[in-house]
């Protein structure tokens, strides 16, 4: 079966113009595993005669059940293109398909149902106007049904089709259908959907997919395709204020300067005023340039180069916006975060936050609560696990321009990237800026770090000792502190155990508390360095991310990481505090090296091995290195072995 439409040559231009004027509906299919999402879209395309003959022939070659005798085709294979998907019979990646009918154009995203691939579902839902949520008639509402419904609501999808699938497997019973619809309506009343349209279907056999089925005489509503062709979208979705993220400054010659990018939303015309979001500079559009020539006006989705009437500071990472509807510019905001990674989200840990325009270092300062997707109850939590949703306060290293996600999906979202693996570990939807950021200002001080350092006749530095418990960190740091003090240096030693008696007495030894422990100490060390001191920090600090965060707080060259490398068995043999004995007996939880991991530094400034060396000798070696370092003599490191 193939779809061929005969168009007389003289009508081609009229047909293309009519096609261009059709509205576009972006929708997703979602739900639990094996609810029939891919099969439904395959059936929709097949029965609407929108599948080409070569695609049908290919289904037989990939071994779809029944294809050889022509009686049955596995329509899910039209969407499941990955080899792993076909082998396992599940959807893994997001499959996008474009098709059109006489009434409307469609872009459909077939998203995976397995919990492990929730991140892919979020990707598909982020641009959708409508969600088809499938439910297996035999199983009813499952946890993944609830999760996908909640995420669809969170991502701003306003319209839902509740496709009660496999109705044939329950003998087309109206009671089963109505019970599922009632259960879902009760669940979804808190989600704020503008419309929910229930439809009983059989994706495999085509009941109520393209046309009404004789098997469900008790259902008098529209078939699925008919509803998709006629559902009305919110008009406000088509009228957002102008937003233009600058992707590149075009400077082909001295007489031309243009700002290239894609219009996120809204429209712009030659002569319209615009504002640079971060600086507030005002100007107007002198010309709109494209590859095909200049335009008088341009709108959402178009890639253009804007030539401005004045020279302004609008480099990559900034945004040109409408003067009467400017975005927020702030470095603190509240957001809903969906966590993707197997490693939990840690408040206090430094991540990379990427928006449509910016890429900045960011920290989750507070996890306010986790959202229970079954009951929507707010629950206290210290971290977010994979596929969990939480409300967080986030702080960025520099101000970013954004809108609230509910007002503008294009400029109100972000992703969170792990600094080590560069993997996308989370996605976020901005709720609102935190006004506290506007009320706190830096106060200019007459006496600065340089003045304090000059008075002490030394350069400030932060010597960060890291290693296992019992490695000798504190012993070596204490000996070095004694040597430097004898030389008249102004120092201070921050010891892990001592700090936990005061500043960090409220923290335990869970991974979340360890992250916060190091964050606080790093901030204290920064203040002490600002006072012109040589700061010795002796903490296990087991995670690379937190040591990197501490380094980034300091000025270039100020942070010196010292890896005190002692084998675990030697640390356990020494066991000066009896902690290893307790940990190995199961009496201490989350003990580094035994029941909690230690991430060794990959490229420390100093790597010292303690076995066979006296603490005093190692302290002297560090002192010699420090003398060269803060004295400006940057000779190659002579690491003690």
UniProtKB/Swiss-Prot annotation:
Residues annotated for ATP binding in this entry: 467-474
Family annotation (Gene3D superfamilies): P-loop containing nucleotide triphosphate hydrolases (3.40.50.300), Translation factors (2.40.30.10)
Residue span of region G2: 89-93
Name of one Pfam family that matches: GTP_EFTU
Domain tr-type G: 22-236
Region (G1): 31-38
EC number(s) given by UniProt: 2.7.7.4, 2.7.1.25
Catalytic site: 541 (phosphoserine intermediate)
GO molecular function: adenylylsulfate kinase activity; ATP binding; GTP binding; GTPase activity; sulfate adenylyltransferase (ATP) activity
Region (G4): 165-168
Residue sites binding GTP per the record: 31-38, 110-114, 165-168
Record's keyword annotation contains ATP-binding: yes
Catalysed reaction equations from the record: sulfate + ATP + H(+) = adenosine 5'-phosphosulfate + diphosphate; adenosine 5'-phosphosulfate + ATP = 3'-phosphoadenylyl sulfate + ADP + H(+)
Function comment: Proposed to provide activated sulfate for transfer to Nod factor. ATP sulfurylase may be the GTPase, regulating ATP sulfurylase activity.
NCBIfam families: apsK, CysN, PRK03846.1, PRK05124.1, PRK05506.1
Protein name stated in the entry: Bifunctional enzyme NodQ
Higher taxonomy: Bacteria, Pseudomonadati, Pseudomonadota, Alphaproteobacteria, Hyphomicrobiales
Gene responsible for this protein: nodQ
